[in-house]
């Protein structure tokens, strides 16, 4: 980072010198266009001073983070056509700037002043491009540079880019080969964070750092005009010593101020429009305690800002935050031994200046909770003395490293070989090789991981590679060192498909872009959104789900609030593969789900997926389906698939109110016998002779059916081989318990029972952000294990820790309730500008 090894004089800050050089060029008239030209024309590059002619080869780059966009740049300069995909939502830029409208190339205007591209860092559109450079690092780095990088690649006719596309879900390697790609490059980044197996390790208030950073800088919690909810209380303890821990600590302090000020502003506006009593209605004791804390802190910050302005001084916000508990980093070794210090000591220095505390040689042994089940403190053991210390902590962030992102090997067994924790490498002939580990500049860049029989190959870069994992710079270096290998293997065989690159790329718009087909209200609280997304529809299997989002740049604004959805986990109810349609169904809960009703036909959206695991469909079984409310939407396709496989289906469909029932014909098609259950009188009148009706809850209905109190029993519970429960966590837990209690005499001793676990979710890209972490406890051994619910949502009822699931579902409950009131306040203005169903 710095020169002067003798430390006898002021050292030279090399990164700042390089950045200053770039800024000097950019600030010239037409400076960006000059820089753009120099990325393609480089007289100092003897081997390739200008981009090579079109090679006819097409490369699929999976992941548009630092490794992905760097690789795309070099491959285009080598003459290849590149299609980049990313599972994250990527916001569109204006066509006049990017030269792209949807998937169509249009003329773009040159940039005269670089200032025209800049956005305030606290208000900029979180565009999604750049992967971890967008969501995983602090705003001390000017993220306006990401827009420049994006324009360098997006404006080129040899490049296409689609967000909301998950490799392994929407698109697979087999699909890519059939479509005519000559090579696939995996730039998929790091995988799931390390889980701390300690008591109360997933209590309310405990999160993975990746979950926090993604919610902050992609979902939009850090923005004053967003409706994203992410609850953070002081004091905060961050576990870990890497740069992610440093970023998490500094962002925690900054976010806390934004959070409480936004809470106070909306609370006061709602109280003025209605009353304080109406705002507080529905809050429980725990939520009232947090609300009083947030309101008191926000008012204190407001008062301090006013006093500072009157006295002509800086507001002492950091001192206040430290007084309220502040943020402490706890690391198992010395500060000087931490990865953050050895990699970038300046970040540590700045964090300490901002008021962070650093605790050395401390390892977590357990989280203590209060009577609400929320974190109140953490126990940390000194690594040398063995002494245990107790730190107050209302929030605990875990930044203890990540695992390689090798989910594909488990999704497609036999297709991707592993070598330890990483994908196995091969040379250009397809022979196994061992890459150097943790070597930012290996002697030989071994970046190939698979060679197909026809000579086409798959490569891997960045955090997923054993030589280059660890940081953004190494990820970019992997692409710079590895692209010649890709070009050589491409040159070793003729292009798979004739035709020019731009036409090839344009053909993907029709397949990968998602647009709203229509929106229909099914009940007073349930909305169906039908989306045209041909590849997402083609890949769907019963039981899977999607992530639905609208675009921030297209979302309406009301009361100064951008009506941008958080990522919604949406059940795939049905698909029409011929028309490329996917139906997803949302239960309006007061927050982002209420925005589904405002989506307009033809509106572009993100429908990432399908994701999750398909439900296991076995032939010749007797299956009992238990659906609660929205859960019935999932069971349409599952029941139909079981019946098509030759199984018998007994279906208990439960609802709170008579008005909540929908899609009756689809449910009837999915079951041999239905028992309609409703908590509300008079219940339902069956329309088929074999069906039954019951007023009460679903467990009571099962008991009554088994006893014959509802009429003739044609599919006895004694014949049931498999139970699938889908609904609220309380409903699924009740079904799980009833199997060992009231229903035990009626069921086979060794039947198989699963539930579709509705963990809170964010990225839904399988083992990335860790918001969906769910602990399991083996009923026989008592051992605890952890499952990412977005990887496999169908989990054995007897293993799920229902208490932890309920607590994690309520992590943001106060913010969600205030947001529900705020949206209700905003929507009249929004309805004036667009139609709602």
How does the language model describe each region?
Residues 121-129, 137-172, 179-188, 257-420, ...:
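A Rossmann-like FAD-binding core segment of flavoenzymes
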Residues 511-601:
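Ferredoxin-reductase
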Residues 1-130, 142, 183, 192, ...:
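Fe-S ferredoxin-like electron-transfer domains
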Residues 26, 30-52, 169, 193-315, ...:
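Glycine-rich dinucleotide-binding loop and its adjacent helix/turn
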Residues 204-232, 367-373, 387-388, 392-467, ...:
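FAD-site-proximal beta/loop scaffold in flavoenzymes
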Residues 245, 461-489:
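A conserved FAD-binding loop/helix module that cradles the flavin
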Residues 1-54, 134-136, 140, 153, ...:
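Glycine/serine-rich phosphate-binding loop and adjoining beta1-alpha1 elements at the start
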Residues 659-837:
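Reductase modules of NAD(P)H-dependent flavoproteins
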